[in-house]
Amino acid sequence: QTRETVEEYPIIDYIIKENKQAYQYLEKQLSRLPRNENVKVLVVDDSTSTRRYICSLLKRHKYQILEAKDGKDVLEVLESQKDVSVIITDNEMPNMNGDELCVEIRRLYSNDEKAIIGISGADSSALSSLFLKNGANDYLHKPFNSEEFYCRLSQNVDMLEQIATIKRQANTDYLTNLPNRRYFFEESSKSLKYLKKSNQDGALAMLDIDHFKSINDTYGHDSGDEVLKGLAVCFKKYFEKQLVARLGGEEFAVYFTDATTAQALKRLEGFRQFIELNSQEFSQEKIKFTISIGFASGPIYQIDELL
């Protein structure tokens, strides 16, 4: 009775203060709300009234909301709005059912890229398993109460964020926040495959801090780290449109995706000169250093060969 009374009002949530978990849930929800403003949810249903109801629930929790009336609309929205995080879809719709839509979405995106929540008012107990087997992350039976809706939605958004964090940590160098060696090899290899198909040349440069060991020996490893971090900031800005990475130690790499050999060489020489003139600004000890650059280009389609 309390639930039914409370849910008549446009509240965000309500919590019964029974135990410590209630306060932990409250804290989690309060931290969740500001982040929801950056989360796009796509609501799919051929029923206008159902879409409006679900959108009203999402609006309370500050989600960005997109709508579609059938599977065809969904695929068009996902083509233009690639940052959609969650798709909430009904099952019985014209042209394409919800379980069929799950299959189409999973052709393009994995479970850890976009979450799908199926909903249906059908009495069939097999429908939930059909949704899940076809790629949905979760399922709700209509009519559902707002509490369950919010809990399931939050859990799926949390899961996506946690996976994104793990991926980011796995692909990022902890010291410089540049992409690491693993990510660089994966992404540049994908690009080289495309270049091979289109009969284009690849271009890659390796950069190394000259006599970096002597910097660590003379000024200490903390100062050496400052030098690496300062160089990384300039590196990222100077080659903003290129794939850059720290390969390890004092070695960095840049893969050119949209530059001719002449343009790449000119850019690299400009960067080398900039570092030579401004390197003392990277550390408290005003350590001056220089960099050496190796460059390779041509019809080479294995990243190991270019390196």
What are these regions (language model features)?
Residues 208, 212, 231, 247, ...:
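Hydrophobic framework residues that shape the active-site pocket
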